[in-house]
Amino acid sequence: MATGVYKTTKKDGSVYYRVSITYKNKHISIGSYDDEFLASAAYAIANDVLYKPGTYYIDKDMHTTSYNHIAAELSNNASLKSSNISDGTSVDFFTFFPYAKFISLINFRDNGIYIKTPIYLCDKSFLYFLNPENILTFSTDDLFYYSHHTILCRGGYYFVNDYGMQTSILSRFGIRNHSVKGRDYIFRNGDEHDYRYENVCVINKYNGVNKIEKNGRTFFQSRIHINGNYIIGIYK
């Protein structure tokens, strides 16, 4: 049996292989595989990620990683492809190595803290890598929360599953589900992926209240919805 690979049997009697690696005295689970070759390859990649920072890295300033580059390199290198899986198929190394695990391992290597969610720590902020093209920035005040909650994205809507409910990440700023970007809240620097507290500005904090500009002055319009919108009044 290859290093870091452990043969296990399921309740139905079928065999699978668990993969784990130890780094800085911490035992880290990589995943489970139905094929021993894939399990061995996953361990090899995890080992390389931890011990080859020049090849496997995160550029925190550019918000990029070497993931896509390495995946493409492996895909184009026939000697690095699997041709020995039980069913005869050929599998590229990075098609089965989780992107989130890639980020977690690099963060642990660079910052000494292992976080299960795809977070990379920066100075006074952290990056959350949903995928190679979608990276969010948060204030460190949110680190504990997102270390224990996985962010999901559907149609540009970012949310977490919190106690069985889909909760928008905007709710942490007091922004309601029906709020409209540009009217009820804005991103100060124009970056809609920057969720640091200093960048998210809540304009309308209350139900039925809209901030309006008239003749260079700011007013607040109050309205109620009863079979249509009715304006209650405009206030300074």
Please report, for each region that a protein language model flagged, where it lies by residue.
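A short, exposed loop/beta-hairpin motif centered on an aromatic-Gly-Thr core
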Residues: K26-F37, N229-K236
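An aromatic-rich alpha-helical recognition segment common to small helix-rich domains
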Residues: V19, A39-N47, S222, K236
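J-domain (Hsp40/DnaJ) module recognition
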Residues: G31-I85
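Basic K/R-rich, polyanion-interacting modules in nucleoproteins and related proteins
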Residues: M1-S14, D61-G216
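Short aromatic-glycine-(Arg/Gly/Cys) micro-motifs in beta-strand/loop hairpins
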Residues: V5-H27, E213-Y230
